[in-house]
Every structure is written in structure tokens, then in C-alpha cells.
Amino acid sequence: MIGKLKGSIEEIGADYVLVDVHGVCYVAYCSARTLSKIGSVGEAVVLFIETYVREDQLKLFGFVSALEREWFNLLQSVQGVGSKVALAVLSTLSPSELANAIALQDKTMISRAPGIGPKVAVRLVTELRNKAPAFAGDASASIGLKQELGEGVASAPVADAVSALTNLGYSRDQAANAVAAALKNGGEGGDSAKLIRLGLKELSR
């Protein structure tokens, strides 16, 4: 089984990269996010690999980090999510954004990925909410917000407040941190408008 490829980029396609490793070229299917990060033809590349072996085919999937590869596998543990849909999710959301969305039970965020309908989005945020922290990577904001909310799922006002702050130009992590601080400082039980106001106050400090 192939776990990692180190070589040079021979070709980049719409959904794959051809990697030359000492004269042997490997096709690795990747998310759009990965393809945007690996560089140009002729440059050196290192990819973490997930190998799929079927009766009639062998496919390699490439990732820029081991964390992204773990998310690829975790996503496919949910019914209705195969390799193609998992790559679409990782093309749309970074691992930290994905961890945030699951911690916040943000189905709308998940549904931005092609191939993810409402039912699959619900299954993703429900089935992965207890697994996501282990795969959060640098998504400390989502973990902090989840701790403020306790073991329950994020309320609609919380998700709306985070979404509103990101629409104002703040990063997902900044928004989640601000809402977590707002909840801690007296915003618990408030509506989205109150959380947005308190969140903006936190961000202005």
C-alpha cells in the first residue's frame, strides 16, 4: 500500500495530478483545494496517499496533509458519502472549516459542497459531531465554542451569529471565537442579534 509520494509534478488535470517518482508516474486524485496548493508542473511535490483497491481498479487519492487524508476517510464513514463527494467537501471546506461546521451543526455550510443535499448534510453533522474534535487540527475555535455550548448541538442563533460575522469579512475561526466569548460573557440564551452585537464587541478589542 502506498502511503506517501515524493516526486515532481508531471501534469495537473481537473481532478488529478500526475507525479513522477524516479521515472514512474502515478495518478493521484485530489480535491481542488489540494491542487491549488501543490505548485506547478516541474516542481517538487509531496502527497499523503490513500490507496483504494477494487476488483477492477486501483486508485490513489492525494492530500497535502495527513489531517486532510483523515477527514477524507472520516467523511466516507457516513452513509451516502463516497470518495467523489468526500473530495467535493474537501474542495469546498478546509479541515478547520469542516471541523467548525460540524461543531456548530452548520448544515448550510456543509451543503455548499457539490453533491451534499440536505439529508446527507444532516447525517454528516449528526454522525460526526462526536468524532470531529479528534480531527480538528488547528480548529481551536470550534472546540472552544463547543465547550461553551456543552454537549448539546449549536442553537440556531449561535450558527446565525457565526454566519453573520463571517459575512462581515471575519474568518470562520475569528467568528467562532468571538461568539464563544460572547456566550461566556453573558450572551447565553440570547438571540442572534445579541450574539452578533457582543461578538463584534469582542472582535473590536
UniProtKB/Swiss-Prot annotation:
InterPro entries: DNA_helicase_Holl-junc_RuvA_I (IPR013849), NA-bd_OB-fold (IPR012340), RuvA (IPR000085), RuvA_2-like (IPR010994), RuvA_C (IPR011114), RuvA_C_sf (IPR036267). It is found in: Cytoplasm. Residues 153-205 are annotated as: Domain III. Its main location: cytoplasm. HAMAP family: DNA_HJ_migration_RuvA. Has three domains with a flexible linker between the domains II and III and assumes an 'L' shape. Domain III is highly mobile and contacts RuvB. Belongs to the RuvA family. This is Holliday junction branch migration complex subunit RuvA. It comes from Agrobacterium fabrum (strain C58 / ATCC 33970).
